[in-house]
Swiss-Prot record:
Protein name: Polyribonucleotide nucleotidyltransferase
EC id: 2.7.7.8
PROSITE patterns tied to this protein: KH_TYPE_1, S1
Cysteines joined through disulfide linkages: none
Residues annotated as transmembrane: none
Transferase found in the keyword field: yes
Domain S1 motif positions: 626-688
Species assigned in the record: Helicobacter pylori (strain P12)
Cofactor requirements of the protein: Mg(2+)
Pfam families: KH_1 (PF00013), RNase_PH (PF01138), RNase_PH_C (PF03725), S1 (PF00575)
Family note: Belongs to the polyribonucleotide nucleotidyltransferase family.
Magnesium recorded as keyword: yes
Biological role: Involved in mRNA degradation. Catalyzes the phosphorolysis of single-stranded polyribonucleotides processively in the 3'- to 5'-direction.
Catalytic reactions on record: RNA(n+1) + phosphate = RNA(n) + a ribonucleoside 5'-diphosphate
Length: 688
């Protein structure tokens, strides 16, 4: 067993090698403060034949890590929580570009959180633990990678803030990469205001992150290299393409390949290439269908990249900086609180907005919070198969859908003025040809406005791409699905005219240089300004139907009156809700009553509640202490009997008073009682 301590970027990390899980290809125990993560890498020895990287990353939180027992009926960890899925994606997107393109061995990376002290960053810790375990496994020539988080407090950037500092920050920037370049970025603005960050400041933050990553990665390589396993897989698994077949495709079928490239829809493009493959297979039996399909993909990709780099033209004939045509429609769904249909080229997002009460907020359990937290702004993204012409059923939300919804939420969250308002936006992707998450951001921002939600500003999103060949590269604005598939970078950027509120960068290369990222940021700003201009024009045409929107009325009563509004077993409040068709939130300690619904019904509900409480007070005023009266048994309970009083209202005769007099009562009996006290609006009785 070996112990390694590394000090870098405001943190002291400890690694225990060969201590646990020794049957894995590699494993380690990572420690930062009182946060402990078990990282393991397992690799199959037989490669798969399919053309993809068979990598699976799983990040798992254990409730005991924070001294908790899982909430809910089943006291065992079950389905992965959103944070676990998003963190798994974060690590996967960082590590995937590091693998050789011909690597085909099934690989599983597992991160288990065994202890967490709340203050240390779980995502940075998990990624660094995964990176170290992968580097030690030495399954292929893979560079060391690390992560850091940048916060901004009082105009000062802070590297790797703890949770307390991050809660004070206006910026949450997560960056991972090697010592030479960046290969994954997640960013969002934080705080009560919009806090969009300008491009020059974003570059400054990224430069700081790059410096931190270089320091950490250099230390990792120096310290971990002596402990690496022997290189596991040296031979190449790359498919060798037939040169004669490539010549045949280039000379005889090139025009048909160009036709397929220029097809806008994925289904249409696939049909064209399937027909080409079928035609060649029938005419040239010496080539297998698999060989033909591989070669077709190679020729297609080479030509697309050549067009972009050399001809400065894209498959759909757009210029490199050109955004596809945009059409915005509003108020399509009469029963929703808002609905916006945003169409950009062949990508179409229908975002529907609904406002709710505090009871509608999503509750989450988290290791990073001592008590369950309420998510008041929800953004759910759905990608049904028909949006790309696929004939398959719709199932549960995928990792990708959760990730895209989270990105859109992060882009819009700080634009909302009232952070206590409960809002749910749902993006239904009806057509997709790239940049659907950014279309969701645009439609979502307008849907907030159309719902009557007060916002600081509209937010627009655009996906940027890049194609790189040697020393040459081209930045693309508003990438299509084909450009995303054949390009080297997917850089989603959202914000307003002043700056950026969220961004996400992934790459298929081992990393992207800062100067290229900054060029993409500036080009994205131009595209964003163009989109925002169209969105502002659409905003002016939106007519907010305030009569249809729910309104909220908040008032206070004496805290001891809340139980009267609830009633026995919730009977009174259920009747009120059913009668007036509203939602009611009650706060017992403060006496606050919050009613939400149609404006007219809300006002009638408030009037009813106040009149109801007043009538109860009047009933009490009719009786005096020591007054003797004839009452009727209304219902028997474990602790006594509730009696109907002759002048209205009811009183409680407690069981001990009945037992003292050896009286046995049944419902409907009449009995003489004496008023002995008034307590919190209740009349206490004794036998006369």
């Amino acid at each position: 067993m070996d112990f390694i301590t590394i000090n870098s970027s405001n943190k002291t990390e400890e690694f225990a090698l060969k201590q646990v899980a020794k049957q894995a290809t590699s494993s380690l125990m990572y420690r930062l403060g009182k946060t402990i993560i078990l990282a393991s890498v397992c690799v199959e020895r037989e490669p798969v034949s399919e053309d993809f990287l068979p990598l699976v990353v799983q990040f798992l939180e254990k409730s005991y890590a924070a001294g908790k027992i899982p909430g809910g009926f089943v006291k065992r960890e079950g389905r992965a929580q959103d944070f676990e899925i998003l963190t798994s994606r974060l690590i996967d997107r960082t590590l995937r570009p590091l693998f050789p393109k011909d690597y085909r061995y099934p690989t599983q990376i597992t991160l288990m959180v065994l202890s967490h002290d709340i203050e240390n960053d779980l995502q940075v810790s998990a990624l660094n633990a995964a990176s170290a375990a992968l580097f030690l496994a030495h399954i292929a020539p893979i560079k060391s990678v690390s992560a850091c988080r940048i916060a901004r407090i009082d105009n000062e950037f802070i590297i790797n803030p703890n949770t307390s500092l991050l809660n004070q920050s206006s910026l949450d920037l997560f960056v991972s990469g090697t010592k030479e370049s960046l290969n994954m970025i997640e960013m969002r603005s934080l705080g009560q205001k919009l806090n969009a960050l300008e491009e020059p400041l974003m570059l400054e933050a990224l430069e700081l992150a790059q410096k931190s990553l270089k320091e950490t990665c250099t230390l990792y390589e120096e310290v971990f290299t002596p402990h690496q396993n022997e290189l596991l897989f040296k031979e190449s698994q790359a498919i060798v393409l037939n040169e004669r077949l490539l010549d045949l495709l280039t000379n005889q079928y090139f025009d048909e390949i160009i036709k397929g490239i220029e097809s806008s829809a994925l289904s249409e493009r696939e049909n064209v290439f399937n027909e080409i493959a079928k035609k060649i297979s029938e005419a040239h039996s010496e080539f297998s269908l698999e060989e033909i399909e591989w070669s077709l993909e190679k020729v297609k990709k080479t030509e697309i990249r050549r067009m972009i780099i050399q001809d400065k033209i894209r498959p759909d004939k757009r210029a490199l900086e050109e955004v596809r045509p945009i059409l915005i429609e509003s108020d399509l769904l009469p029963m929703a609180h808002s609905s916006i249909l945003f169409t950009r080229g062949q990508t179409q997002s229908l975002v529907v907005g609904v406002l709710g009460t505090d009871n509608d907020a999503q509750t989450h359990e988290s290791l990073e919070h001592k008590t369950p937290i309420k998510e008041r702004f929800m953004f759910h993204y759905n990608f049904p198969p028909f949006c790309v012409g696929e004939a398959s059923s719709i199932g549960a939300a995928s990792r990708r859908e959760l990730g895209h919804g989270n990105l859109a939420k992060r882009a819009l969250e700080t634009s909302i003025k009232n952070k206590e308002q409960v809002i749910r936006l749902v993006s239904e992707i009806l057509e997709s040809n790239g940049s659907s998450s950014m279309a969701s951001v645009c439609a979502g921002s307008l849907a907030l406005y159309a719902s009557g939600v007060e916002i600081y500003d509209l937010v627009a999103g655009v996906a940027m791409g890049m194609v790189s060949e040697g020393q040459d590269h081209a930045i693309l604005s508003d990438i299509s699905g084909l450009e995303d598939a054949e390009g080297d970078m997917d850089f989603k950027i959202a914000g307003n005219l002043e700056g950026i509120t969220a961004m996400q960068m992934d790459t298929k290369m081992s990393g992207i240089k800062l100067e290229i990222l900054y060029q993409a940021l500036l080009q994205a700003k131009e595209a964003r300004e163009h989109i925002l201009k169209i969105m502002h024009e659409a905003k002016e045409k939106i007519v907010i139907n305030f009569s249809h929107l729910p309104t909220t009325e908040i008032f206070n009563v004496a805290p001891d009156k809340i139980v009267e509004i609830i009633g026995q077993g919730g009977r009174v409040i259920k009747e009120i809700v059913e009668k007036f068709e509203v939602k009611i939130d009650l706060n017992k300690p403060s006496g606050e009553v919050k009613i939400m619904g149609n404006k007219e019904r809300v006002l009638k509900t408030k009037e009813f509640i106040l009149n109801y409480l007043h009538s109860l007070d009047q009933e009490l005023e009719q009786y005096a202490i020591d007054e003797v009266l004839e009452a009727q048994v209304k219902r028997i309970v474990d602790f006594g009997a509730f009696l109907s009083l002759p002048k209205g209202g009811e009183g409680l005769l407690r069981k001990q008073n009945m037992d003292r007099c050896q009286v046995v009562l049944k419902e409907g009996d009449s009995i003489k009682c004496r008023v002995i006290s008034f307590n919190k609006g209740k009349i206490a009785l004794d036998l006369a």
